[in-house]
């Protein structure tokens, strides 16, 4: 941790002090808006600050320590959106809707140094719209999903992409193909390591249908998702292991200045982003992934260095700063 010597000879740890300052602010934020948090009321709080304190604030909200400071990036005039809620008797729950969004400035993606990966969630399907658990059922994009993929293609049209990867399933593959329409000659490699979590007997079901047969398991999925193995399906640790192994293989194959497109699914993207942020499988609800949303991961110190989550879940190309994509099941 950074240590400085002050004029009087005493030692000063600026990052440690920032984390303490951010922690006090979070406590005050919770106390000031307790009624809205517990009552489910909608309140929007604008916080304007400097690069370092905003990163410290996000770490505190996510329950992370200062070791994650360099995992985040905050550009000038960027917007990050975090959603807070609290059930009676439970701690405050935090969801990162987006991080370091500067699309409104009209400058495209932030500049990069070193390898870059563009992690995209597939466009919408009919089952997303209906709220059905689709898992490994191979549902294609609907018309809205194709429009989302084309919007992502337009947004990324000026980005130089050298490699592209997707899940073997139709919805991410179709999304990747539409994005690559602006990047002729870039081959698409599909890999089973990026397929969606297997929901087993939940696949094709609406939440209320699952609640009739597996009410306790569904409640656990919402409260403690890392403890659940789907009936005849997968658990998050299995998805975590295969998605991270695939991610590391993709990263390891990049040259120093290459950019790769990776198109996958909600749970897969969440496990990857949680790992990069220093979170665990228990924390996947902390990260939002909208259909057609773009996240950016950089390796500014090279492939052997630590990754930086430069942007998370950018959806401005789909119509606004806030994520208005379907809130359907995985």
Regions found by a protein language model. Give the residues of each.
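Short catalytic helix/loop segments, enriched in acidic residues and glycine
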Residues: 137-150
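Short glycine-rich phosphate-binding loop at a beta-alpha junction
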Residues: 35-48, 160-168, 187-191, 259-263
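Phosphate-coordination/substrate-recognition cap region in phosphate-metabolizing enzymes
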Residues: 1, 8, 150-219, 248
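Short, conserved phosphate/pyrophosphate- and ester-handling motifs at nucleotide-, phospho-/glycolipid
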Residues: 50, 122, 145, 265
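Acidic, low-complexity terminal tails and accessory targeting/binding regions
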Residues: 35, 41, 59-124, 129-132, ...
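Ordered, small/hydrophobic-rich secondary-structure cores
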Residues: 1-86, 188, 241, 245, ...
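Short glycine/proline- and acidic residue-enriched helix-loop micro-motifs
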Residues: 1-17, 217-237
């Amino acid at each position: 941790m950074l240590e400085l010597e002050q004029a009087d000879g005493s030692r000063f740890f600026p990052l440690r002090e920032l984390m303490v300052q951010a922690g006090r602010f979070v406590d005050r934020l919770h106390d000031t808006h307790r009624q809205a948090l517990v009552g489910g009321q909608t309140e929007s709080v604008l916080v304007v600050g400097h690069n370092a304190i905003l990163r410290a604030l996000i770490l505190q909200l996510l329950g992370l320590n200062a070791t994650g400071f360099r995992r985040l990036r905050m550009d000038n005039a960027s917007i990050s959106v975090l959603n807070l809620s609290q059930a009676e008797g439970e701690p405050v729950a935090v969801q990162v809707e987006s991080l370091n969004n500067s699309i409104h400035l009209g400058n495209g993606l932030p500049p990069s140094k070193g390898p870059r990966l563009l992690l995209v969630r597939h466009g919408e399907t009919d089952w997303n719209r209906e709220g059905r658990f689709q898992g490994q059922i191979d549902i294609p994009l609907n018309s809205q999903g194709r429009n989302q993929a084309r919007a992502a293609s337009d947004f990324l049209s000026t980005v130089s992409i050298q490699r592209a990867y997707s899940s073997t399933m139709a919805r991410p593959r179709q999304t990747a193909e539409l994005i690559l329409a602006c990047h002729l000659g870039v081959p698409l490699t599909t890999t089973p390591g990026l397929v969606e979590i297997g929901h087993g007997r939940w696949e094709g079901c609406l939440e209320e249908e699952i609640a009739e047969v597996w009410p306790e398991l569904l409640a656990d999925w919402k409260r403690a998702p890392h403890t659940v193995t789907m009936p005849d399906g997968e658990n998050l640790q299995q998805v975590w292991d295969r998605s991270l192994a695939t991610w590391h293989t993709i990263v390891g194959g990049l040259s120093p200045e290459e950019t790769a497109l990776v198109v996958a699914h909600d749970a897969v993207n969440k496990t990857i982003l949680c790992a990069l942020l220093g979170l665990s499988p228990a924390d996947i609800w902390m990260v939002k992934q909208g259909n057609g949303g773009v996240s950016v991961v950089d390796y500014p110190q090279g492939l052997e260095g630590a990754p930086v989550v430069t942007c998370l879940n950018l959806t401005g190309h789909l119509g606004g700063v806030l994520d208005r994509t379907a809130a359907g099941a995985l």
